[in-house]
A protein has these predicted regions:
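Beta/alpha (TIM)-barrel catalytic core signal, keyed to glycine-rich beta->alpha loops juxtaposed to Asp/Glu
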Residues: 2-159
């Protein structure tokens, strides 16, 4: 999912005014480009960016690194979706090796991807919450990370 196009100056100026009045503490952006982030930062402080990103959809790889360098949080939306059957088989193999679920491995990969990534996975029950929390305890070996990185490699090299 590509970021929205166009200027965000007008709506973001309104949000910045609410922040100035003390009605909003922090402001973040969702589904934005680097240019839109720069536009918003010229208006007020930004604490996070939330864009479409997961193991299979990796267009923001460089953006995440830039944000980490600048101390800004990155919240991937749709962190568990969009895997093809071939990608899922690679994820299944990693999960079997770790005695975990494929989704736990996908979340663990995100957590190990960069220190500025904050996850908010959908959780529909206490059992699901426990499953998601276990992802934080998984440690993916470097060779497994390298293999999982290949899942999104084709998309990153596409024109």
């Amino acid at each position: 999912m590509a970021p929205s196009e166009g200027s965000i100056e007008e709506p973001f100026t309104v949000l910045a005014e609410l922040k100035r009045q003390g009605l909003v503490r922090h402001l973040g952006l969702s589904n934005v480009s680097r240019e839109q982030l720069a536009e918003a930062q010229a208006i007020t402080e930004i604490v996070c960016v939330q864009n479409f990103y997961n193991l299979a959809h990796r267009h923001d790889d460089g953006f995440i690194d830039e944000l980490a360098h600048r101390g800004l949080a990155y919240v991937p939306f749709f962190p568990l979706g969009g895997f093809t059957p071939l990608q899922s088989s690679a994820l299944d193999a990693a999960a079997a090796a770790l005695e975990a679920t494929p989704m736990q491995v996908a979340l663990a990969w995100l957590l190990q991807r960069s220190p500025n990534i904050l996850l908010i996975p959908g959780t529909s029950s206490v059992g699901h919450l426990r499953e998601n929390l276990r992802a934080a305890t998984l440690r993916l070996p470097a060779e497994m990370i390298a293999g999982l990185d290949l899942i999104g490699a084709r998309e990153r090299t596409a024109p």
